[in-house]
UniProtKB/Swiss-Prot annotation:
One of its GO terms (cellular component) is plasma membrane. The keyword Chloroplast does not apply. GO terms for molecular function: undecaprenyl-diphosphatase activity. Catalyzes the dephosphorylation of undecaprenyl diphosphate (UPP). Confers resistance to bacitracin. This is Undecaprenyl-diphosphatase. InterPro entries: UppP. It holds the Pfam family BacA. Its EC number is 3.6.1.27. It is a multi-pass membrane protein. It catalyses: di-trans,octa-cis-undecaprenyl diphosphate + H2O = di-trans,octa-cis-undecaprenyl phosphate + phosphate + H(+). It comes from Pelobacter propionicus (strain DSM 2379 / NBRC 103807 / OttBd1). Keywords: Antibiotic resistance, Cell inner membrane, Cell membrane, Cell shape, Cell wall biogenesis/degradation, Hydrolase, Membrane, Peptidoglycan synthesis, Transmembrane, Transmembrane helix.
Length: 273
């Protein structure tokens, strides 16, 4: 992984991990289309660390509030307020994806990484699902109204994000909209519930990398990838949360349809060969 590739793919990760357009699809399809070599474990660590840093910095006040609320809930042995419930709802929503990811992430990645046609189709299919949820969802509920059942349902949907082309933020926002939450509530809970998942993935891959050792010459690309994905990730979170306050998610749906259609067309017409 050279420095330029690390910067470009780091920025691509930061943007596409946050926006509902699938980071895994872009990180597979872009190198495939450009003929770049596959990124290894070192760069996977950079991407996850960068994304985690972006989320932690942006949601730092929420994280502190949840920590205080957790202590308060334990102290009073009560979950009688939305603030006291939120940390436990975030944890509950992360459980399904954590279990499925631990058991099947490697198999799913190997199954779809070499099948760009399926990735293109999933971009289209789940883009349509996002569009329908945004169009027909009632949007009457706020994030403070999330219940345990809501958190578990959204968490189950998050399991699908292991499939390239689905999008973690996209599928969880879709689930939130289907459950009647407004766009801001669905998006904000989507990001908060991603914190333990992204943290766990970053820690797991980092431990694996430390066990293997950082390959010679990859220290600088590793740092560049972390910074690039962190900066663009932070900007993308801020942008999306402002965007959904006043606008629909339709532009992201159209992007998914066009990008997925382009990938499918390239493959079926043999242009990539």
């Amino acid at each position: 992984m050279n420095l330029l590739h690390a910067l470009i793919l780091g920025a691509l990760q930061g943007v596409t991990e946050v926006l509902p357009i699938s980071s895994s699809a872009h990180l597979i399809l872009v190198p495939w289309l450009l003929g770049w070599p596959e990124s290894g474990l070192t760069f996977d660590v950079a991407l996850h660390l960068g994304t985690f840093l972006a989320l932690v910095v942006y949601f730092r006040r929420d994280i502190v509030d949840m920590a205080v609320s957790t202590i308060d809930a334990v102290k009073h042995r009560s979950l009688d307020t939305p603030a006291r419930r939120l940390p436990f709802l975030v944890i509950a929503s992360a459980v399904p994806a954590a279990l499925v990811g631990k058991l099947f992430e490697t198999q799913i990645e190997e199954l779809f990484r070499s099948r760009p046609l399926l990735i293109g189709l999933f971009l289209i299919l789940f883009g349509v699902g996002l569009g329908l949820a945004d169009l027909f969802g009632r949007k009457r509920r706020f994030m403070a109204q999330v219940t345990v059942s809501h958190a578990l349902v959204i968490g189950l949907f998050q399991c699908l994000a292991l499939i390239p082309g689905v999008s973690r933020s996209g599928i969880t926002i879709t689930a939130g909209l289907m459950l009647g939450f407004n766009r801001v509530g669905a998006a904000r809970f989507s990001f908060l519930m991603s914190l333990p998942i992204v943290a766990g993935a970053a820690l797991f891959k980092m431990l694996h990398l430390l066990d293997q050792g950082i390959p010679a010459g990859e220290g600088l690309p590793l740092a560049a990838g972390i910074v690039s994905s962190a900066v663009t990730g932070y900007i993308s979170v801020a942008f999306l949360l402002r965007f959904v306050q006043k606008r629909s998610i339709a532009p992201f749906v159209w992007y998914r349809l066009i990008a997925g259609g382009a990938v499918v067309s390239v493959i079926l017409t043999g242009i990539s060969g």
